[in-house]
Amino acid sequence: MARDKDLSPYLDFDRETWRHLRMSMPQVLTEQEVVELRGIGENIDLDEVAEVYLPLSRLIHLQVHARQELTQATETFLGEKAPHIPFVIGVAGSVAVGKSTTARLLQVLLQRWDEHPRVDLVTTDGFLHPTEILKKRGILDRKGFPESYDQRALLRFVTDVKAGKAHVKAPVYSHTLYDRVENECVTVSRPDILIVEGLNVLQTGPTLSVSDLFDFSVYVDAALEDIERWYIDRFLKLRQLAFRAPNAHFSHYADMGDRAATDEARRIWQTINLPNLVEHILPTRVRASLVLCKGADHKVARVRMRKI
């Protein structure tokens, strides 16, 4: 049974309790599909999907269904058909914590429900200001911090999708080039569900924020020392992968030795990613509808679900 800590806004579930909330949902992914969805350095498997993500997809499905019933009630009241309003989900968390994998898994799992097969995923990386602008403003070393994003464009994008516009475009970002891809975009066309994944998607501001438009949100959490270790491990693996790609922005790291690469990864973590996490990302955790708490093995050990 979930632990209800008196004044806490969350219900706490250990993994054993949470997995039973899957009920009779069948496993809809194959091992190969999970491998293809897995991020660098992660060891997610079919058990993790069955015990963590299937219950989560069931919860979201029920909330989408409730929203659809509310829309039908509005239609009955007005005596006319209401415009289609996508259900919007935010997925937040630190660099290297596994939020991108969580978002991809949710997209695939939610697509398997007959009631909402059209599920789009957009990352906020595409809304980073172009590198040229960041250089002019002197904030290239603060890439990923709130001020490095075109917040207005991101808000306008989600607002347009939520308003039911037929075709809404979002810019595309290349981690290999470390910049937006010129003249390239993704188009979102009235999906049933839109997933928005990014570092700071749960942030608030003095006026309307993207997080105000979310119907549900997930924060992927872990101990700081674990995330640092995962970040360094991922950096070392990228030397043999993305850093060696043609035109790779970080190609100068490709031939670094293990010691030098580890030191550089730790420097980047401690001077950029850790401050961003502590100052801007972690404080938004309290706004999440649900928190996935990972253990040192990169697997979800506990789930916290907001009561209200």
Swiss-Prot record:
Compartment(s) where it occurs, according to its Swiss-Prot or TrEMBL record: Cytoplasm
One Pfam family from the record: PRK
An example Gene Ontology molecular-function term: ATP binding
InterPro entries linked to this entry: P-loop_NTPase (IPR027417), PanK (IPR004566), PRK/URK (IPR006083)
Keywords associated with the record: ATP-binding, Coenzyme A biosynthesis, Cytoplasm, Kinase, Nucleotide-binding, Transferase
Top-level taxon in the UniProt lineage: Bacteria
Family (UniProt): Belongs to the prokaryotic pantothenate kinase family.
UniProt name for this protein: Pantothenate kinase
Organism encoding this protein: Corynebacterium diphtheriae (strain ATCC 700971 / NCTC 13129 / Biotype gravis)
Originating gene: coaA
